[in-house]
Amino acid sequence: MSIPFGVDLGNNNTVIACAKNRGIDIVVNEVSNRSTPSLVGFGHKSRYLGESAKNQQTSNIKNTVDNLKRIVGLPHDHPDFEIEKKFFTIPLIKNEVDGGVSGKVKYLTKNHEFTATQLLAMYLDKIKDTALKETKGNISDICLSVPGWYTEKQRRAAADACKIAGLNPVRIVNEVTAAAVGYGVFKAGELPEDEYKKVAFVDVGHSSYQVSIAAVKKGELKILGSAYDKHFGGRNFDFAIAEHFAKEFKSKYKIDVHENPKAFYRVLVAAEKLKKVLSANTQAPFNIESVMNDVDVSSSLTREELEELVQPLLDRINVPIETALKDAGITVDELDSIEVIGGSSRIPAVKTRISEIFGKPLSFTLNQDEAIAKGNAYICACHSPTVRVRPFKFEDYNQYTVSYFWDKEDEEDDHLEVFPKGGLFPSTKIITLFRKGPSFEIEAKYTKPEELPKGTELHIAKWKISGVVPNEGESSIATKIKLRNDPSGFYTIESAHTVEEQIVKELIEPAEGEEVDEDAEPQYREVKKLVKKNDLTIECESAALPDAELQAFIEKEASMVMEDKLVFDTEERKNQLEEYIYELRGKLDEEYKDFASDQEKEKLSGLLMKAEDWLYEDGEDSTKAKYIAKYEELASIGNVIKGRYLAKEQEKKEQYRQKQEAAQAAAMAEKMAAQREASKKQESSSSGKNNKDTEGDVDMD
């Protein structure tokens, strides 16, 4: 069975948590960091994922993809695409699969195009591997968090990415909701049992800013209202700082860093560092060596100047807070706590502005970087049959109004608003339609465009329901359809079946207070009831990838994983050969000199020289098999000599051990002899004393 694990997919860094050892633990990566850069890079031999992509990013800027969560499920013609383009260093194009975004990169020396879903899947595959190596267990079930403003299309794309990576997305959860669940679970001892505590959760991340108002008590949570600014985050602060210095350097040094992607990226990296320094200091230097054209740049910025630069951003902080409170139907005075998370909440100006808007002190009792991941891991554990967890019920906030439409027949309506904005989910509604058959279609749509991000497609999904057969002599039959806004926020039709009227007898119960004659016959009445007749066939066309395309992506990802593994194994074999050459050469004239004949030394020295020359010339970029063959050729002689040396060393150790044992035995024998001698002396002394006393006694009788 899979170890339950949760993933907080951050735009800049990702945090993994797993449920084990009766608790929730953060999973560290290969360099022992508690978060992993959300990056995918491509090279001429293999891919770079996470930490390795970060290490290569500056030199491989044109083939490194970041901001993964911003483009997954995003249509290429969406207005947000134009906003996102400036944050990417690779060309973004329209893909032919679903009209979404693809990235163009150079991989294995050829040009490739990968969809945003594929790119996210590559990264999630790396996350899976990290969790697998750290936990040493089976990893398949995942709870993945996404921004609360994600539409159905984006949520489906995230779920598809999980499947391509070989993961089972047991639940897709809104990010702030996951943190709120963690709050409710891990602070259960501090929560009231009978009445709800009102808590505002504020998440200021790398690329977006979200606010949710929750009602929480022991064992239960409801999200009452939620709002967001999807273009407000740490990267916007970094960009503002970078643009400030780009303008300054153009005037001061006569260089334009916008002309060189690598140069502008270095300015962005330095801007992020400066932002962090100014969170703890009032002034910070800004220096970059040879930023471009061999020009060194130098400047500085004060915290006051930074706040002036980002004032337009700070002025937007109030809107999501006010909207979330309004949607929740409560006032600031009714809030019991304001919990703040997200890396960008550490910026002093952001903290100050949030506190001023609420008019209350902020609480930082949740781990700002890990709260979402831990909440996800708990939610995933709830779906696991192998892990026992404390019961906790939670319901999320439906962000957008959804209606279901069908072809009108007779006098009935042709649509129904089923899941309004502000409703809680998961939620189920059952509708009854009279259909003539043999099939009909139902479509789900967003019906209030003003609630949606501008430019969002209204269509969600379409279902064809077939197998409808009216009763003989009737033109239509009642059809019951179960509509569902499921735990992952997907809008679905769970089931459909026809029903027919049947007359059944129902016992007539005596009225309250009426005397009952126990000998009287029971009285029945005939009533009409709807009884299930036949299950109907449901075919769905949703934003999820069709099975054939999903399978093709799964196979492509598996192929790239094998390619990466081969490159990794080849590099390991190359390093093994190199280390062996240096080890033998260093020891052949020292430790091993007495264990090899002159002929063996001469032969091995020649082989070592040839192997080294080959390794740094023709063998610089060779195959795994050739590295193994070269190693085995050297080892066939070297290991014999090494074996003689080790045998002699073992013999010396054995002789030393025997000598030590003999010395210890002799010392023990000497000690025991001394003890016996001392014992004899004591006995002799004791016997002499007794004799003397006897001789000195005088009989007084």
Swiss-Prot record:
For bias type Basic and acidic residues, the affected ranges are: 651-660, 673-683
Q: Where is this region: Disordered?
A: 651-701
Q: Does the keyword Electron transport apply?
A: no
**Which PROSITE patterns does this one have?**
HSP70_3
One MF term in GO for this entry?
peptide binding
Its predominant location is cytoplasm
Arranged from A to Z, the UniProt key words for this protein are: ATP-binding, Chaperone, Cytoplasm, Nucleotide-binding, Stress response
Q: List all Low complexity biased stretches.
A: 661-672
* Gene Ontology annotations for the cellular component aspect, listed alphabetically: cytosol; nucleus
The Gene Ontology biological process terms listed for this entry are: maintenance of unfolded protein involved in ERAD pathway; protein folding
InterPro entries in alphabetical order:
ATPase_NBD, Heat_shock_70_CS, HSP70_C_sf, HSP70_peptide-bd_sf, Hsp_70_fam
- Spell out the subcellular localization from the entry: Cytoplasm
Q: Which family does it belong to?
A: Belongs to the heat shock protein 70 family.
Quaternary structure, per UniProt, is: Interacts with CGR1.
Return the PANTHER family for the record. Answer: HSC70CB, ISOFORM G, HSC70CB, ISOFORM G-RELATED
What more is known?
A: Has antigenic properties. Elicits a specific immune response in systemic candidiasis human patients undergoing malignant hematological disorders.
What is the official name of this protein in its record? Answer: Heat shock protein homolog SSE1
Organism (species): Candida albicans (strain SC5314 / ATCC MYA-2876)
